[in-house]
């Protein structure tokens, strides 16, 4: 198992807790698809801790009343040799 997959287990658990317990208490308000929590889940499943944290934070900061929102998928790995995220 790749080390970043082990490190990402804690943030994944927190996001899943948020989605199962806290999110149902509030009306839907995310302006993007996938939702910010789904985006963060995918980011932590796809990227290392630091990149996933940055992508998730940047997405949450952009999710505000002044944003158009819309479709915003998690970017894939860049695939550059020697720049692996594991």
Swiss-Prot record:
Any one Gene Ontology cellular component term annotated for this protein: plasma membrane
Protein topology in the membrane: Peripheral membrane protein
Primary localization: membrane
InterPro entries: Membr_insert_effic_factor_YidD
Pfam families the record matches: YidD (PF01809)
Record's subcellular location: Cell inner membrane
Region of interest (Disordered), residue spans: 66-86
Key words of the record: Cell inner membrane, Cell membrane, Membrane
Record-stated family: Belongs to the UPF0161 family.
Function: Could be involved in insertion of integral membrane proteins into the membrane.
UniProt-listed PANTHER family: MEMBRANE PROTEIN INSERTION EFFICIENCY FACTOR-RELATED
Protein name: Putative membrane protein insertion efficiency factor
Species of the source: Chlorobium luteolum (strain DSM 273 / BCRC 81028 / 2530) (Pelodictyon luteolum)
